[in-house]
């Protein structure tokens, strides 16, 4: 075959101008970015196959499978690699570096903002690289490979009476690596905030072992002045990285303190505050939320906490969503381990889709509800906490409707209602298709009620009347919006709305993303939040 026919560019000899034919396979050339331009996929595939024990998939079907996550984007990868070992990962990075091919780590593909799809070599760590490495029961830590699914890790640790705070609703298939990439939180992150280390993944991490694109393997974490001096004195690439990070934070420390909102759910942007001296120059925490743009995670040591032996759930019914939001702070004073909000529109969607319809009768009267969960060592303790909160609320002039649940089976059914929020807001019969793009904004919890009023007003301006729900105890609001992403006019409207919504949440001292990360959908809004 002549050189013209095997080069990676459109040419007259292929089936059409967008295809390259080589070894009885067509390569689609439409998906080339400045980062991937010039990469020879044929030679890259051959070298990867020779070098690693894992799977190398450059076929059209595999690339189509990995071209999307759970969000709005479809971008065909250069190819897919599924490593079996740490050595495989090191070889993949080294080979891709020689070919100048971008690399993207991927876990369960549950990201909602386009983080795990791109024109890159996608490295799926979930199939093989998913083991528990070390459990330290006394120290309450666990070291894992990044491809392990959260529920699988928790099933292991809970055998020893230990659990992990952050738990996204996709806990049965999201991976620890993806959670670290997103700085994930979840329903019971408030448990970790009240009784553990903090709400987000960055708070529940001790150290990480990472690999840079230029092949440097290092273990990172909090860095004392003495440790920093030892690293710098040792020279080499790690010393160079640490020195540059130190210069960065020294230069912009005051601006970082000023511009990064100090709220429970600030996920947008890099975690530069974790490099501040008062945070212990924590390089591991600073890398959390970097969405595979800085390093590849090889392993992570996470902080565990005792599993609550007993739980009690109270559901509160309010006349409207705004009222429920305005009373969050009063409930937080009782230190629940979960505090979630849902509205009547979400319940209507569930009824239309047939989601948990037999369980909806468990809800007390109202048009909006708060699910408040208490944890402790005994049912007596958790029931007492719940009843103390209920007594306080009953003393109000306008108390909510209240149901206390002692049956664990009923409690599980009610949590399934909340966890169905994402599915209940998508593909509702008779309604326009809804999309991600502005689905996880967050504000200080004390401002949640007023923010919900303002957000509804903004939705009404665009003619949208959509369900709202979320992690109200931490000021995070979830929704899906009927964006028109198919026409130029619709895309213009999408852009106008997201910019207006970004200005709105920033005016409340909030964050563009409170859980799902910036990804591709929100990255260009960061200037509104942090300035140029």
Predicted regions and their residues:
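Glycine-rich anion/phosphate-binding loop at the beta-strand->alpha-helix junction
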Residues: 175, 182-183, 494, 515, ...
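FAD-binding subdomain of flavoenzyme oxidoreductases
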Residues: 131-135, 141-328
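Short, hydrophobic/aliphatic alpha-helical segments
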Residues: 89-103, 157-174, 178, 267-287, ...
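Acidic/histidine-rich catalytic neighborhood
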Residues: 521-532
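N-terminal flexible segment immediately upstream of the FAD-binding catalytic core
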Residues: 2-98, 108-140, 169, 293, ...
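C-terminal substrate-recognition/cap domain of FAD-linked oxidoreductases
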Residues: 57-66, 274-280, 284-496, 502-504, ...
